[in-house]
């Protein structure tokens, strides 16, 4: 038994422009060294570019892209009888959102390294790709699903 107390979840205040907690979490993922204003400029700029390209509202694009990237299943390592199995488990809502935000950020950062574009443009492209069920973040989700499908035989070792 752990002697520590369970860490309490911090309440994140919604962002100033769209009044969304999810967008505030995304800004926190992108933020480096506490430079919130720079992260906000990047996110709001990418969303406004996506909005002008598609003609839909920025929040609907962001939420649709997030829903397309959020995983429902993942594999967890479970050691039983000296053998480690990759056991497929369902992903909790909060973890699914965190993974989706992180994957969109990583895919945009990888695209930034490959090309000479600004990060704002790469983030806009990645959001549009996720919106259309393509791109690096969606690929990461599909890899999780493939792993879960391949290890379906070990699903009876689920965590209690």
Swiss-Prot record:
Sorted UniProt keywords: Ribonucleoprotein, Ribosomal protein, RNA-binding, rRNA-binding, tRNA-binding
GO cellular component, one term: small ribosomal subunit
A Pfam cross-reference name: Ribosomal_S7
Highest taxon listed in the record's lineage: Bacteria
Gene Ontology terms: biological process: translation
Gene Ontology MF, one: rRNA binding
Xref: InterPro entries: Ribosomal_uS7 (IPR000235), Ribosomal_uS7_bac/org-type (IPR005717), Ribosomal_uS7_dom (IPR023798), Ribosomal_uS7_dom_sf (IPR036823)
Family (UniProt): Belongs to the universal ribosomal protein uS7 family.
Summary of subunit composition and partner proteins: Part of the 30S ribosomal subunit. Contacts proteins S9 and S11.
HAMAP family, A to Z: Ribosomal_uS7_B (MF_00480_B)
PANTHER family xref list: RIBOSOMAL PROTEIN S7
Function per UniProt: One of the primary rRNA binding proteins, it binds directly to 16S rRNA where it nucleates assembly of the head domain of the 30S subunit. Is located at the subunit interface close to the decoding center, probably blocks exit of the E-site tRNA.
Protein known as: Small ribosomal subunit protein uS7
Organism: Ehrlichia chaffeensis (strain ATCC CRL-10679 / Arkansas)
Lineage start: Bacteria, Pseudomonadati, Pseudomonadota, Alphaproteobacteria, Rickettsiales
Gene: rpsG
